[in-house]
Amino acid sequence: MQKVHVIAHTHWDFEWYFTRQQARVQFAYHMAEVLQALADNQLDSYLLDGQLAIVDDYLQTNPDKRAAMMRFVKARRLFIGPWYTQIDEMVTSGEAIVRNLQLGHKLAADLGGVMKVGYLPDSFGQGQDMPKIYQGFDITATVFWRGMPHEKNARYFYWTASDGSKVLAANIKNGYYVGVDLIENDDTAALLHRIATDTQAHDLALPVGGDQRAVDFNLKDRLQYANQQTSDFELVEDNYPDFFKALSTSSDLPTYQGEFIDPSASKIHRGIYSSRADLKHLYDRLEHLMVDVVEPMMVIAAHQGIEAQDGMVAHIWRAIARGQAHDSSGGCNSDATNQDIYQRGVEALQLAESVRDYLLRKLASGAPASLNVFFEAHQRCGPFIKMVRSRWQRVASIFHLKMKMVKSSRMKS
């Protein structure tokens, strides 16, 4: 008998063919249902789509619900994180992916705990370095849907990166919405045999939820009905961390390496790689400005006694993270939504440029004569700001060099 771990969840794009403002209104009412279902024990647990952006928006307008959320998070009944937004891996830089996870982890920890599962149920293809990135955050398991080719057809497997990093992966081949049939269709056998294909594992995952779907308050009744209809499967309410703990005892799981960007089993929407190039250019420019210029300058400034503006940096990275959600970065949205995305990017870029310009003026005009910091050049480097002081002028120049701080005597003029 195989064990089916039934996982109640929502998939909640914070913007798509609807605007962020429309989504915020609907999510506020959805959270009322979630908290009620958990308080009344109509659900054992619930997954908020693995992202904190929707929670961030919700708590801005519903701060009185923070305590209730924290109570359920700490009790391992409400699962949040590890992401800030549900990114697209193929049009997002590696640094932005890491920052997205950092932000998601921080906010989830502040609310009581982060779900240590790399949960990306709708990202349009899977990057080859994701196991490496996940291991850097002590994430040992991942859930995704899109990109698996027919020749690599295992539902559950170990996914490795080129450096040997490994995570246990669940490919939800039938989509994150497959479990809706458990609620709306009495043909339980057909559903269970569908999710049992391409695996010999004893433990199976059955996600129950969908895009902006209302809470299924009758889940327990439907589980009872399903268990009465089958002798081949046992269905239990569960969550992804406990599912992976059970799955990890399987001894016959295959190992795959590399990226998964094949549309043979699920759509990966290749058109999003080039659609709305204006958005992609804007956010790419913003990412590079932060990573290659603003943050290095802030380090230099801090060395000279100029206080770092960590809150401002975090604010800009929040805007970047919202621009890297899979629909937002893909530009596959309504015109109104794309206008919102573009305007957020413009405002964040203006803020980043203002930080850069201020620090440049401050450093160029006020660097002490005894400035004792310089930077060595290395190959394979990114740009940084090198401050050159001479007897007659102070010049700020951008070189394509790697930043490395070393001790030095006073620079010669």
Where are these regions (language model features)?
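Catalytic-domain carbohydrate-binding cleft regions of carbohydrate-active enzymes
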Residues: 1-385, 393-413
